[in-house]
UniProtKB/Swiss-Prot annotation:
UniProt keyword Transit peptide, yes or no: no
A Gene Ontology term for the protein's cellular component: bacterial-type flagellum basal body, rod
Gene encoding the protein: flgB
Protein name in UniProt: Flagellar basal body rod protein FlgB
A GO biological process held by the record: bacterial-type flagellum-dependent cell motility
Amino acid sequence: MLDKLDGALRFQQEALNLRAQRQEILSSNIANADTPGFQARDIDFSSQLKKVMEQGRASGTGVSLSLTSARHIPASTVQPPDLDLLFRVPDQPSMDGNTVDMDRERTNFADNSLKYQTDLTVLGGQIKGMMSVLQQG
């Protein structure tokens, strides 16, 4: 039964994970806006989500969970997928080779943040719906 619940929530979980990783990439771009030669990077969110949904996340050296009771359910550790980072082509290249366009980065950052919040709301609604079904029997 737990595998069915996991399958029902997996898409939103993976979308949230990718949005969080993209937010880190975008914040790195913003932080390095004045670094000479820094190349702005991003990911193609839809293709990365499709890749993760098809291939799954690799088992590996992610965060391990400790079991303090024999009744705890063991969990396998997973690590974030290897993202295909893309270099952004600048609209106006700077003299120092930096390709960060702050307007574009801020817009992408705000857009990604809004979509992250939306995904959280959808996931919360799914969980509330499942809880309602379970409570009603």
